[in-house]
């Protein structure tokens, strides 16, 4: 028997974009670039690490900004209700070192993401992917485990996950993503997203 699982992106869906918040707090506008602007994740991360080193910003500086952030208003309630009816996993290209305080505020949902390499001085010197294309690969494995998967995200780095899932949904995407991926329904509120998730699972005989 198939079971239902929802996979969600974190930043831009459940939480604000961490790097945008860091850019605003530190006054370094170049740090505000996200996968919405640069779909090549390795190129984006190398640029971020270079900027952090040039400006002598370490993990404690970033964590200070994150601790002052909270989830998107309504995210906790949305997740709580969603988890009553479906299995829910957050698939994110963030890092455990960043996400911990935000997960606490969301009542510790399951999160698969990446990790950072920190030196003795607290500087971020490298990053380590869980695996290449982890979002898409996770969805593929869930399907192999006989789950019906509905995925939601907001950006370029979510589109492989959306494409691999039985159904994909965009949440607050930028216009360029809407233009390039017109096959996905677009939602702008948690109520709309929940309704679209329910509709997708209602079509299980068609999509699974």
Describe the predicted segments one by one.
Residues 117-121, 190-197:
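A short acidic, often aromatic-flanked loop/helix-cap motif at beta-alpha or helix-coil junctions
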Residues 2-115, 119-120:
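Alpha-helical substrate-recognition element adjacent to the catalytic core
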Residues 97-149, 180:
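Substrate-recognition "cap/lid" segment bordering the active-site pocket of phosphatases
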């Amino acid at each position: 028997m198939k079971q239902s699982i929802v996979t969600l992106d974190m930043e831009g869906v459940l939480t604000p974009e961490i790097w945008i918040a860091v850019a605003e707090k530190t006054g370094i506008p170049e740090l505000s670039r996200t996968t919405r602007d640069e779909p090549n994740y390795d190129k984006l991360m190398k640029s971020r690490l270079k900027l952090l080193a040039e400006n002598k910003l370490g993990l404690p500086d970033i964590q200070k900004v994150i601790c002052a952030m909270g989830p998107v208003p309504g995210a906790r309630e949305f997740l709580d209700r969603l988890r009553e009816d479906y299995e829910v996993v957050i698939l994110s290209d963030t890092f455990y070192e960043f996400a911990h305080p935000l997960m606490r505020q969301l009542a510790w949902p399951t999160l698969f993401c990446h990790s950072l390499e920190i030196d003795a001085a607290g500087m971020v010197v490298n990053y380590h992917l869980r695996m290449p294309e982890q979002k898409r690969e996770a969805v593929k494995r869930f399907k192999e485990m006989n789950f019906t998967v509905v995925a939601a995200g907001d950006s370029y780095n979510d589109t492989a996950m959306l494409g691999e899932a039985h159904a994909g949904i965009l949440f607050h995407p930028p216009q360029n993503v809407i233009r390039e991926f017109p096959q996905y329904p677009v939602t702008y509120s948690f109520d709309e997203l929940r309704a679209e998730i329910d509709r997708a699972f209602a079509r299980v005989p068609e999509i699974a």
